Design a protein with these regions (language model features):
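Carbohydrate transferase catalytic cores enriched for Leloir-type hexosyltransferases
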Residues: 1-392
Length: 392
């Protein structure tokens, strides 16, 4: 049977569906694709670890969940997963991270969210991890029929670092789920605060302890802001916590913040709107982001955002949030004081942020992604690169 005479098969790599960050992209994109009427023209095979099947919502009949337990960054994904893709006779494979297993004969679309691994190799655990990242990203960029990235900043990074032709790269912004746009009743904010033992008022940081998340400068700036104005606020540090937390815990103690810092760990998505909405401000002065989804989600919740004037954060939040140099502790502290003590400034940035968040839609991202699939399946030539709407 010819390819034209049967329903085309599209595979989506969802093995990182429960990962922090990229998991949100995978879950929301698949759910939004499933809602699109044009998706019913295809059969989808969604590859998910057996333990994570419940992370995806119930999908329509043209979606099949396939258990695939080969971990990322492993020999298994280059062998066992590769053989599975070959046997499944896919017409197109969407690599939602940056690994396109060898042997796969299907056309390929790859999403490269950012290239932090190669721009900041000091953030990787060892040189082997750096080598793997470089090799697999380069291979994916050569192999892919279409390349998706999530910001114009990431597109520029790909062009500058790897020499990729701009016309091969499609920028598709992440979306913001509907749960973040709802006006939450006070009772929901109170429920979340009680569940996690959050004192009021509080400032929120979300992101864990990876070096590029810049949590140490956030703590230093918070301590400086408290010294300057005796702020009544607590600082909530939400996100994954490593087994060995001694360095950050030692810094918290050295800054005399033990009584003012709350660490709830990973907060599930259903509680995030209440966590955001209960904060006086959201602090996200990270060193590098490919998009910065928590910034868009906080904006949608009507929370004023303090974030970085670097990487994609300038593109996503510039003009709509309080921007700072993430390496300047004094600047972060001044921003904290400004937002914590000035209700008018908070209201201004809350309104601006809500307007900006309206630009980010998972339904639009799904529509654009399906268009990329169709072009890749047709073998259509790359369209001229869209102009970057943000200045360099």
């Amino acid at each position: 049977m010819s390819r034209a005479a049967r329903t085309l098969r599209i595979g989506i790599d969802a093995r990182k569906v429960n990962d922090y960050g990229i998991g949100s992209y995978i879950r929301n994109l698949i759910e939004a694709i499933a809602r699109r009427p044009e998706a019913s023209h295809y059969l989808f095979r969604v590859y998910v670890p057996g333990a994570d099947r419940g992370a995806l919502p119930e999908l329509p009949p043209h979606f099949e969940i396939v258990e695939e337990d080969s971990p990322g960054y492993s020999i298994a994904e280059l062998t066992r997963f590769a053989w599975r893709l070959l046997r499944d006779r896919l017409d197109l494979f969407h690599a939602t991270h940056y690994v396109i297993p060898p042997l796969a004969r299907a056309r390929a679309v790859v999403t490269i969210h950012d290239i932090i691994h190669v721009l900041y190799p000091q953030f990787l655990p060892n040189r082997l991890a750096l080598l793997y990242a470089r090799v697999m990203i380069r291979r994916a960029l050569r192999r892919a029929d279409r390349i998706i990235t999530v910001s114009y900043n990431s597109k520029r990074d790909l062009v500058d670092y790897f020499g990729i032709g701009p016309s091969r790269i499609e920028v598709i912004y992440n979306g913001v789920a509907a749960r973040f746009r709802a006006d939450l009743p006070r009772a929901e904010r109170d429920r979340v605060a009680e569940k996690y033992g959050l004192p009021r008022p509080y400032l929120l940081f979300l992101g864990g302890e990876k070096p590029h998340k810049n949590v140490r400068n956030v703590l230093r700036a918070f301590a400086e802001a408290r010294r300057a104005r005796a702020l009544p606020h607590a600082l909530v540090l939400a996100g994954p916590m490593p087994k060995n937390r001694s360095r950050v815990e030692a810094l918290i103690a050295a800054l005399d913040l033990s009584a003012r810092v709350v660490r709830p760990g990973v907060v599930p998505e259903e509680d995030l709107p209440g966590l955001f909405a209960g904060a006086d401000a959201f602090l996200y002065p990270t060193l590098y982001e490919g998009f910065g989804l928590p910034v868009a989600e906080a904006m949608a919740c009507g929370v004023p955002v303090l974030t970085s004037s670097t990487s994609a954060l300038q593109e996503i939040a510039g003009g709509y949030a309080y921007l700072v140099d993430p390496m300047d502790v004094d600047a972060i502290a001044r921003g904290i004081v400004d937002l914590a003590t000035d209700p008018a400034r908070r209201a201004e940035f809350a309104d601006l942020g809500k307007r900006r968040a309206a630009d980010f839609s998972w339904d639009r991202a799904a529509e654009q992604t399906l268009r990329v699939y169709a072009e890749a399946l047709r073998g259509a030539p790359s369209r001229p690169a869209a102009p970057d709407p943000r200045p360099e």
